[in-house]
Structures are given as structure tokens and as C-alpha cells.
Amino acid sequence: MKLEQVPTPSYIIDLGKLEENCRILQEVQEKAGCKVLLAQKAYSLYKTYPLISKYLSGTTASGLYEAKLAREEFPGEVHVFAPAFKEADMEELLQISDHIVFNSERQLRKYGQTCREAGISVGLRLNPQCS
């Protein structure tokens, strides 16, 4: 297809370059002993998730719907963060998340034990002098 024939708006992905970059990130994971996660808020082109998931450990989601997308399309860990969690969302997140980061001690007190009982690791976001 000629470039002029591509409908707009369109995203054109160089899969070779994407895989090359993923290999670099995999090497970082191995050498640093850490996990590299795909930030879905910045990149949610799920058609490329099968390729990316070969190299990265999982995803980060900024809420329930991104977490659902991750669980459905990206074989790996699902990490979730949100400024606040609704009760109904938390019930679903308990079924699909591997790690949840809370934005306040209050949220951690409210949901932390329930998460741990469901086998989900938890974290607390700290912003010294800000929150």
C-alpha cells in the first residue's frame, strides 16, 4: 500500500525497531535484576502486546479498564495505580491484579489487608513534601 493510501489517522509501527528496543529493555532487566513494565497510559497499542510480552515482565495500569486490557492481552504481571479506587473497581481489581500501589495511607489501611489475602502485593506511593 502506498503511503498516500493509508487512511488517517493511522499509527505505523516498525516492528523490527520495536523488537530491537524490547531486547534492550530485556537486557536491562537481566543486568539490573529488575522488572521492566509497559506503561499502558503512554502506550496501549495492544496489537503489539504479543511481541512486547516476550521481553517485558508485565504492565502498569492507571485504573480498572487498563488493568482489564492488560490481563486480557498481555501475558505477564499486572501492576495497578490510581489516585483513588472505587469499591466496585477494587472488587474486580482483586481478580486481575498482581500488585496494587495506593496513593495514601488511608487507602492502604482500607484495602491493603484484603489485597494481601487475595495474594496481591501492595505498595504505597510517597511524595515527600507533596502528599
Question: Would you name each region that the model predicts?
Answer:
Residues 1-12:
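Generic N-terminal amphipathic, Lys/Arg-enriched alpha-helix
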Residues 34-131:
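Active-site-proximal beta-alpha core segment in soluble small-molecule metabolic enzymes
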Residues 3-4, 22, 64:
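Residue-level detector of functional hotspots within protein domains
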Residues 21-31, 69:
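A short, N-terminal amphipathic alpha-helix
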